[in-house]
């Protein structure tokens, strides 16, 4: 099993290129199922979750090739098996995103209940209720969502859908289902993440009629068919945020090429409050540590608030900043699993329910630690970069789910880091 060996204490300097966003690429791969014409996606990151999604759609009979330049060419004209089996999706939450497109185009789908995440419950009931409002009949049995249209319907029907909570994958599923539905669909309480806006832009290129993406109310006028398109996946704001925290925590200075400062407002504001200099530059984001950092308290919320996917990484920065801070996690109920591993490095953190209290300005010492989920693994890498001595991060398959060649990019910034097999 691969591990990362980090010898800490080096400031990060130079330039790094931010990859395409995993959380945009996955729904956009599913969106290609909506058309029988060729779709080309560029800037697709080489990640384990992407490889799993490609394997899934190939299993449906779809032609899909991912080349070394990050381009994926898909032709779903040959799709013959509208099923997402458990064996292929048990490691990945995003499998549920196949449900809407398959229902919209074929009127039927059989999708395994998703797996792939240890950080908390993410029930699919909102997906089911929304698609039922559009006329679908869905039965959950034996670990599968079995969906179809009743005999009197040839297409999904437009509807007004208001979810009980903001749901990113739910918004994406409804968006993809609605573009081929009959009539108008209105999504209230819609998620506003940039990745949803990017998905909508791709669908519009395919011929969809969508307004309001990027707001809490999206209106879709259904069309009878969609064509192919070429689309570039938006840059990964979470990867960019991770590198911003790593550079600032190590006292470095770096340019993040392709980084979108307009997608990271809440994180950048906290970094500036901590004393880092962060600015948008032509082609990216510049971050420079300017003296000792000051610990910052924050609360995770839906976009455009502070992202839950950046909670662990910013906590790692707070470990070496001056002062005490409180981190409140409002999105997931089990997202402090990295805390126990940080304690092994000498961190001083206490937790009470969804609140973690961190005493900063600590001297961390390298140790063997274990990744428990995707973003926790990134936070342990950051902690290892600032710790004295060697840190060995185990179970980095979690990291590979969402970061494209992270150790290579960090090494390019001057980190002493290598992948080892033990």
From Swiss-Prot:
The protein's name is UDP-N-acetylglucosamine 1-carboxyvinyltransferase
Q: Which cysteines are joined by disulfide bonds?
A: none
Entry keyword annotation includes Ligase: no
Q: Which organism is it from?
A: Delftia acidovorans (strain DSM 14801 / SPH-1)
Which of UniProt's keywords are assigned here? Cell cycle, Cell division, Cell shape, Cell wall biogenesis/degradation, Cytoplasm, Peptidoglycan synthesis, Pyruvate, Transferase
Give the protein's function.
Cell wall formation. Adds enolpyruvyl to UDP-N-acetylglucosamine.
- A Pfam family this chain is assigned to: EPSP_synthase
InterPro entries referenced in this protein's UniProt entry, alphabetically:
Enolpyruvate_Tfrase_dom (IPR001986), Enolpyruvate_Tfrase_sf (IPR036968), MurA_subfamily (IPR050068), RNA3'P_cycl/enolpyr_Trfase_a/b (IPR013792), UDP_GlcNAc_COvinyl_MurA (IPR005750)
Q: What is its main location?
A: cytoplasm
Binding-site list for phosphoenolpyruvate: 22-23
What GO molecular function annotation could you give as one example from this UniProt entry?
Answer: UDP-N-acetylglucosamine 1-carboxyvinyltransferase activity
- Annotated UDP-N-acetyl-alpha-D-glucosamine binding sites: 93, 122-126, 309, 331
- Enzyme class at the top of the EC tree: transferase
Q: What is the lineage of its organism?
A: Bacteria, Pseudomonadati, Pseudomonadota, Betaproteobacteria, Burkholderiales
